[in-house]
Amino acid sequence: MQKSFLLLFFALLPFSLSAQHLFLQLGGGFAGHYNAHRPVGATQVALGYEFELDQHWALAPSFGFAGKGWEEADRLTPDLLYDAAGQPRRNAAGEHLQRTDAQGRPVQSTMHRDYTAHYLQLDLPLHYYHRLAEHRYLRFMAGVYTAYGVGGRRRTRGDGTAAGERKISYTDPTFSLSGSRRFDAGLKAGVAYQFPTALTAGVEANFGLLPVNRLSSDFTKEGRNVSLLLTFTYHFDRKKRISAPADAF
């Protein structure tokens, strides 16, 4: 009974707060590592609450889902031979045999790997509003974030060292790989324009400070997350910041 009461309390808590401060943020863009070969897609969905400190400053914590990822640079791998049972084919010296071309030269395969990583993310940014005109604001944002990885996958294509169909493509859970880290934390900054309606559109960047993977048998280098997002924020009260002080300009 007590657990049910607590669950109901936390479920209804957002509705007990003033609706004018609730907001929903959606974002999409690009993510990678500082040393990644190419960026991949990034997404963000978060529900937040803005605590106004005065007519310019506000604290806006939010909690939601963040999708990140990265790509590794392509690399060559030997095209190894296996028998029908998937066991390595070896020569008299016990060495794993490698496929060769018509001239007897070893054949190599180009291996490509890309990663997705899904996080539950808590943002704690500070907003500064600069009034441009009536009902129109420029919003500057800076703060910190912390996140915990809950899912994702590594997709490998063209791995010549694998057997059977895995030479073509296979996947592994991102956070089950040796050297992977679920915790992520870093800094965030951005700028946005608040329309006279309930919508705010902007750009934000997230800079990871903690390595999310270490050098290991599964990773050739250490990596930290970085992302750039186009964001859209919906405020549940269209009358937000209608009244401005005389010194707002």
Model-derived regions, located:
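Extended, folded domain segments that form the structural surfaces/walls around functional sites
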Residues: R113-R131, L138, V150
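Residues on the lipid-exposed face of transmembrane beta-strands in outer-membrane beta-barrel proteins
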Residues: L26-F30, V45-Q55, F63-F65, L122-Y128, ...
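Short glycine/proline- and aromatic-enriched beta-strand/turn motifs that initiate or cap beta-hairpins
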Residues: A19-E50, T233-F249
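Membrane-proximal, glycine/serine-rich, low-complexity loop/turn segments characteristic
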Residues: Y137-Y145, N206, I242-F249
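Repeated loop/turn-to-beta-strand initiation elements of outer-membrane beta-barrel proteins
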Residues: L22, H56-L59, R136-L138, T197-V203, ...
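Sec-dependent N-terminal signal peptides
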Residues: S4-F15
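Extracellular/periplasm-exposed beta-strand and loop segments of Gram-negative cell-envelope proteins
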Residues: G32-R38, K68-Y119, Y148-D184, K188, ...
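Positively charged n-region of N-terminal signal peptides that target proteins for export
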Residues: M1-S4, A19-Q20
